[in-house]
Amino acid sequence: NLKLGTYLYGGKVVNKKTTLTSTEGNYYGESKDIFFYKNVLLVQPNGTIKTDSLQYNTITEVSTFISPTIIKDKKGLTIKTREGFYDIKKKIANLYKRSIIEDSTFSITADEIAIDSLNGLSEFRGNAVYRSKDKEQGFDMIANNIKTNNKRSTIMATQIPLLIIKQGSDSVFITADTLFTGRVIDLLKTKNIPRVRPVPIDTSIKKGVTKTIIKDTVKVAAAKPTIKKGSSKNSIDSVKLKSEPTVDSTLKYFEAYKNVKIFSDSLQAVGDSLFFSGQDSVFRLFDNPILWSQENQISGDTIYLFLKNKRPERLYVFENALSISKVDSSNYFNQVRGNSINALFDSTGQVDFLTARGSAENIYYAQDEQKRFVGVNKNSSDLIEIIFAEGKPKRVKFINNLEGNLLPMRGKTNHDELKLKSFNWLDKIRPKSKFDILTGN
């Protein structure tokens, strides 16, 4: 390749709207390549490139990075790379060796990065890490493949993706086959978002209650139900949210598809799919999810978990709702079943109060003060309300059409037959740590 020109004490090349300056440079006429060295600066109308060494082709207008390089645009975006190229004409770039892209709102890095600036598309391959800098809605997304759409403000992660939603000291870790996030305000233009009408929970049973065992069960066969008829089945409601009040344009929503696993210190869950919106702070779990809270396993067709101040506040389970808790180290299980279950959490994330409505059933293994079993309560009614203490049932209230009795622990009592419909103790698939959801243990 014939070298036609060299400068050693400063030079400048102007090509259309691109200006390149450096201390030294070599120009090769046959290939139309210019190699710039020392204090290299490329200036364009939309940004700058600073580096120590740069190859530039005057025909293709492709800049090739061969040393540590900093790229800045006029919108505040910064790219740091050590190897790659940028096509000025096509507005595309390929970057290698764990380049970093960041601005005031996020940072992202990966082994390889492909950027299409004209269409606002980017792909990050190999150990990609996205970090949001939003203090209120902060999250991290980690995967072997992340695709972003700047025009739509969306992110999709695949290939062992992990989402970390920052919730103070108790962050939520989520994995699935595919993770996706976007802006709520954009979603509302095209989709119906499932909403929940608040179902009132009568906590009057809690007033004046001390720690009592199940033998003090309150039987209120003729009392008025605390939840109106039909309110449970119709509690899940799809609402066209175009009529909602103005939505904060920064609010995010998250979706997870297939093999969803969730871990936090206070709660764990598995399911088929998930939707979470920053607008109402509700985790929606679909297709027979299972949720664990301390000693309790809760399952159903659909589960809605409400957060307040970034902590679990209440839980709604719709259709085939079942709560199970193992009695200490025994092979016995306390159970509550109904068409729906509503639960409240205390400040530590443990179930504090629970109601089961619609063909509600309850199995409870009563113990005395020395933890000796005294019998099994088997009851059913229209509505069952349960008080918990330290995550364990302490008092039960039955409302309307009460039926049941206390069975002996031995004799004719078949404990397997006492397991309610859909009973399945699934502690073996419960995520025990944030590492479990990644390794599949």
Positions of predicted regions on the chain:
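Structural signature for solvent-exposed beta-strand/loop edge elements and short helix-capping sites
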Residues: N1-N441
